[in-house]
Amino acid sequence: MLQTTSLSAMRIFEAAARLGSFRAAAEELNLSPSAVSHAIMRLERDLGVALFERTTRSVSLTVAGQTLLNHASNAFEELRRGVEQISSNKAQLLRLHCAPSFAAQVLSPRLPQFLKENPGIEVRVAASTNYARFVDGLFDADIVYGEPLNREDLIVIPLSEEIVLPLCAPDLAHQIKSPRDLFHQPLIRSDLKRIQWIDWFEANDLGPPPSPSMSFDRSFLAVDAAVNGLGIALESDVLARRELESGKLVRPLHRICRDNRYIGHYLAYPKSGSQRRLARAFADWLTRECQPASTGSE
């Protein structure tokens, strides 16, 4: 049966099934809609099973069609990887998806060391607040903010514990001697942070906090605002590690207040797949890199 099924027919089927439209598949493959329709009918005849349910306005996959799509998608992805590997001088390609602030503050500064330790690997990074869809075959690993909910087919590794605490520029720190001094300082809010100022004030028995003087939708922007002396940021010591180590930021209430701790970021990658070994090597390296480091700035 497989010998009578052409690769081109399978490619047409995969495009139509993935896009949910014969016309869209025709546009993608630069074919006419009738050519797509006839190719799929021939494929159904050769296989002896209906792959699509057709109405006057739409098509949808049958159970058999969905099963074939799952296998066809994996097969074409593996074929693409093989062509990419033999047509490139680079040995391997690692495609990462990452939470934006972690990408900017943690991953990007450390990638040169990873590439130095792993010559012949090319790394591509895409950043967004969404989770990577591994089923599409677009990414090999994902660094996410917050524990992944759908982890049945994933290996999920918690990265280091993060301490969320007030951070500010050294010049501003001289005005802060106790937690109550924060009532009189401009507070910087990170909109997507799971731990907010209200949580920190409550942990320190201070009551409701004053309204923030500014807010940002990314932690790396809040960190940068604090570096520039715009106020006090409630941020992760992991995301602000470079700034703490360089002295651009300090912890004005270190050891005299209660801070919030949690696992903020996780690394996830599929349990199976041709890139599993490379993803595992990256996970091992990143886990080592995220180990806590002491800072001299307080």
Curated annotation (Swiss-Prot):
SUPFAM superfamilies to which the protein is assigned, alphabetical: Periplasmic binding protein-like II, Winged helix' DNA-binding domain
This protein's UniProt keywords: DNA-binding, Plasmid, Transcription, Transcription regulation
DNA-binding region listed in the record: 22-42
InterPro entries: LysR_subst-bd, Tscrpt_reg_HTH_LysR, WH-like_DNA-bd_sf, WH_DNA-bd_sf
One example GO MF annotation: DNA-binding transcription factor activity
Annotated GO biological process: DNA-templated transcription
Domain HTH lysR-type: 5-62
Pfam families linked to this entry: HTH_1 (PF00126), LysR_substrate (PF03466)
Family assignment from sequence similarity: Belongs to the LysR transcriptional regulatory family.
Protein name: Uncharacterized HTH-type transcriptional regulator y4mQ
